[in-house]
Amino acid sequence: MRSKLEVCIDSISGLEACINGKADRIELCSSLELGGLTPSDELMELASEINIPCRVMIRPKKGNFEYSSKDLQQMFRDIDKTRSYNLDGVVFGATLLNGELDQEFLDELIRHSDGIKKTLHRAVDTIPKTIEAVEIAINLGFDTILSSGGYATVMEGLAVLKEMQQRASGRIEIMPGSGINPQNISEILSDSHFTWLHSSCSIHRQNSKITDSQTIKEIKTAINV
């Protein structure tokens, strides 16, 4: 079975590019330049009207992934909005000052997300024990881990990602993301089958980055080779 492509977007034009490029799934965000924050209600509503599954970034503030009880309540509200729009799922992560995943906080979010899909985002790449996090994510109840293997890009962390895939043993999806493009797909998929790949599929235009439907098509073509 061929791999599928999830595209992260933060605008209406990004939604349109995903439709035109035939993305398999969307990660819905705002402020991708900050690593992705919770999207607006407007973008969630528009996403609910298209025929592509969407997972919603639940990240109320920029910076690190350490959160307060006030943040937790805001994240609960954003999860409720995701559910109200009948979107596919949510994407979140949380860490402690000691560099470990905040399992207690994540458990609260997981419980509040009952009935929809849950992705552990790249907060997992900020902790020292990225590989060991696979078992933690499984036990917490995540469906997917988005990761670059603890490195800046998937190509740098590919060996770690393949070890994470072996650890997962089909119990959770390991979804490589960061720096994926049409040129490196074959190397990423050699020796390991990742069910999902994650990319912004963006190009530079007038001092900014935009989601590009042609790049989506090129990555999907490379996947099918």
Residue ranges of each PLM-predicted region?
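C-terminal alpha-helical cap/extension of soluble enzyme domains
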Residues: 62, 86, 136, 168-225
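Glycine-enriched alpha-helix->loop->beta-strand junction motifs that scaffold or abut catalytic
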Residues: 20-26, 50-53, 85-89, 112-115, ...
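Structural motif corresponding to the early beta-alpha repeats
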Residues: 44-81
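Hydrophobic faces of well-ordered beta-strands that scaffold small-molecule active sites
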Residues: 3-7, 26-28, 47, 54-58, ...
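Glycine-rich phosphate-binding active-site loops on the catalytic face of alpha/beta enzymes
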Residues: 26-37, 81, 85-97, 142-155, ...
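Catalytic cores of alpha/beta
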Residues: 10-20, 66-79, 125-140, 161-166, ...
